[in-house]
Amino acid sequence: MLAKRIIPCLDCDLQVPNGRVVKGVEFKQIRYAGDPVELATRYYEDGADEIVFLDITASHERRETMTHVIEATTENVFVPICVGGGIRKPEDYFKMLKAGADKCSTNTAAIKNPELINEASDLVGSQACVVAIDAKRRYIENPRESDERFIIEVDDGYCWYECSIYGGREFTGIDAVKWAMECQDRGAGEILLTSMDRDGTKMGYDIPLTRTMSENLDIPVIASGGVGEPEHIYEAFTDGKADAALAASIFHFNEYPVPAVKEYLRSRGVPIRL
């Protein structure tokens, strides 16, 4: 069995010189968490398996993303780095990989132009093409009311999950599970799946969503949104069947350092690199 991955996520606001890492709740209530290069270096030294940088305002502001931050980070960080935000065309993938990133993540641009996934995977390979999906629950009364939605049973009823774009500012009407399956068919190598309902809440990942994605895809699924303690990551791997777990708050604010999380998972029988 492949080892599960622990991935700290750095949500970056580049409206200040050199950028800053921030964290919100349900994509709102933003607070400052630290310097991106310093945090990435700390997580690398702590044993993170990968690091994700998300430029949270690049797509909304229609600008390019953080090449200078990635260049500075890769001078001292030697684990895979994934960059998202402001990736709009195949050349952007090439530019970020040249700056030192190993993967690029797209959300808004891929939904606006699905052919981007095909073009990027042809240019840099599927392993470098991650599609980020920010999904929000949409409850329904009758699970049979729509053949166009992938209906999922959750604790308090039935719902489908709608994709959002522009950092959660706009909704698309697109079913998240069906969109992920299309992304896989187009050449995406991985899905970064964020529950908007759980983001920053520390209530745990959205397990029904994560499990449904994992069971319907052949490519890896990264669970994101809601982790508050190591038990939540364990649940993402066991109940949610995720291949990797992304977290922010518990690492940024020193609630649970990466080594402690990994040791906990190892003690519970999860295959993990220490």
UniProtKB/Swiss-Prot annotation:
InterPro entries: Aldolase_TIM (IPR013785), His_biosynth (IPR006062), HisF (IPR004651), IGPS_HisA/HisF (IPR050064), RibuloseP-bd_barrel (IPR011060). GO terms for molecular function: imidazoleglycerol-phosphate synthase activity; lyase activity. One of its GO terms (cellular component) is cytoplasm. Keywords: Amino-acid biosynthesis, Cytoplasm, Histidine biosynthesis, Lyase. Pfam families: His_biosynth (PF00977). Gene3D superfamilies: Aldolase class I. The active site is at 11, 134. The keyword Cytoplasm applies. Pathway: Amino-acid biosynthesis; L-histidine biosynthesis; L-histidine from 5-phospho-alpha-D-ribose 1-diphosphate: step 5/9. GO terms for biological process: L-histidine biosynthetic process. The keyword Cytoplasm applies. Signal peptide: none annotated. Its EC number is 4.3.2.10. It is found in: Cytoplasm. It catalyses: 5-[(5-phospho-1-deoxy-D-ribulos-1-ylimino)methylamino]-1-(5-phospho-beta-D-ribosyl)imidazole-4-carboxamide + L-glutamine = D-erythro-1-(imidazol-4-yl)glycerol 3-phosphate + 5-amino-1-(5-phospho-beta-D-ribosyl)imidazole-4-carboxamide + L-glutamate + H(+). Belongs to the HisA/HisF family. Heterodimer of HisH and HisF. IGPS catalyzes the conversion of PRFAR and glutamine to IGP, AICAR and glutamate. The HisF subunit catalyzes the cyclization activity that produces IGP and AICAR from PRFAR using the ammonia provided by the HisH subunit. This is Imidazole glycerol phosphate synthase subunit HisF. It comes from Methanothermobacter thermautotrophicus (strain ATCC 29096 / DSM 1053 / JCM 10044 / NBRC 100330 / Delta H). The gene is hisF.
